[in-house]
């Protein structure tokens, strides 16, 4: 037994290189071998194709009919370069032409707009030839003359007022009062009517004087004269009116009418205080009235 075992162990190394004959292969072994062969073939084809592509990339020259075509390639490259430069020059020329055309069109538009603006503004800004240019002195003279004319026109408006003289009887004395009023006022109209009535009547014609002395015409004229005297009786003036008249005359003589008016319009003036007290009384009356009305309501 020991010898058999030693022989088996000695022959184990030789079994590694042992290849059985074709009849001893199984179907599985054959399929595996076929697959391995196909994989090896595919790998070889891939390697061959890769080497061909690399060779095509690194080939510096082309062969045409067994000869080198370096000169033809140089000519083609030069033609391409010249064609590229020519196309670039054409592009730049076309761009320049388009730029000049756009500038010309822009200038034309600006000129048209300026011309239309001048047409719109031109006739208004023109100075009429008939009117000469005035200097500063002439303008001052014209302005001063215009002011004088305006003052002259305003003067008659101010002097349109009419002076009225009224005669009053105060304690047997005759008092004359002069006023300046508008001609359209009631006092002026009444004064004009009264003055017309007081005018002397014209002489009676000769035909009337030839009548007998005992006629009724003389009686009528005598009665009218008596009625006129009665109508022309002087109006009486009260003491209050006389004092007021004297105060107005004093203010005019002293020239203090404006100062008194300004003082009276102030807070310390008598008129302003009186108006304030009147407003207070009126307000107090309104408050009392509201209270009475509120109490009367149910």
Curated annotation (Swiss-Prot):
Modified residues (N6-methyllysine): 218
Crosslink position(s): Glycyl lysine isopeptide (Lys-Gly) (interchain with G-Cter in SUMO2): 149
Pfam families noted in UniProt: BCNT
Compartments, record wording: Chromosome, Centromere, Kinetochore
Phosphoserine modification, residue list: 82, 85, 116, 215
Primary localization: nucleus
UniProt function note: May play a role during embryogenesis.
Note: Gene duplication of the ancestral BCNT gene leads to the h-type BCNT (CFDP1) gene and the p97BCNT (CFDP2) gene. The latter contains a region derived from the endonuclease domain of a retrotransposable element RTE-1. This repetitive sequence associated with the BCNT gene is specific to Ruminantia.
Record protein name field: Craniofacial development protein 1
Organism annotation: Tragulus javanicus
């Amino acid at each position: 037994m020991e010898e058999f075992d030693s022989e088996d162990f000695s022959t184990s190394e030789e079994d590694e290189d042992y290849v059985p004959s074709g009849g001893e292969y199984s179907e599985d072994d054959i399929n595996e071998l076929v697959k391995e062969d196909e994989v090896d073939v595919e790998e070889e084809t891939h390697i061959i194709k890769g080497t061909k592509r690399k060779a095509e990339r690194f080939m510096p020259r082309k062969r045409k009919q067994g000869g080198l075509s370096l000169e033809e390639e140089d000519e083609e490259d030069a033609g391409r370069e010249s064609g590229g430069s020519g196309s670039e020059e054409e592009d730049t020329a076309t761009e320049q032409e388009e730029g000049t055309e756009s500038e010309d069109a822009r200038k034309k538009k600006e000129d048209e707009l300026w011309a239309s603006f001048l047409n719109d503004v031109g006739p208004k800004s023109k100075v009429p030839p008939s009117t000469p240019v005035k200097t500063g002195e002439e303008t001052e003279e014209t302005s001063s003359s215009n002011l004088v004319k305006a003052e002259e026109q305003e003067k008659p408006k101010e002097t349109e007022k009419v002076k009225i003289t009224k005669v009053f009887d105060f304690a047997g004395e005759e008092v004359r009062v002069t006023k300046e009023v508008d001609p359209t006022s009631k006092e002026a109209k009444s004064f004009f009517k009264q003055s017309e009535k007081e005018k002397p009547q014209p002489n009676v014609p000769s035909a009337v004087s030839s009548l007998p002395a005992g006629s009724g015409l003389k009686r009528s004229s005598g009665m009218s004269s008596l009625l006129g005297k009665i109508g022309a009786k002087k109006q009486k003036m009260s003491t209050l009116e006389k004092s007021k008249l004297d105060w107005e005359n004093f203010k005019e003589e002293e020239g203090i009418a404006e100062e008194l008016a300004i003082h009276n319009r102030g807070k310390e003036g008598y008129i302003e205080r009186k108006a304030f007290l009147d407003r207070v009384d009126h307000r107090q009356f309104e408050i009392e009235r509201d209270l009475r009305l509120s109490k009367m309501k149910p």
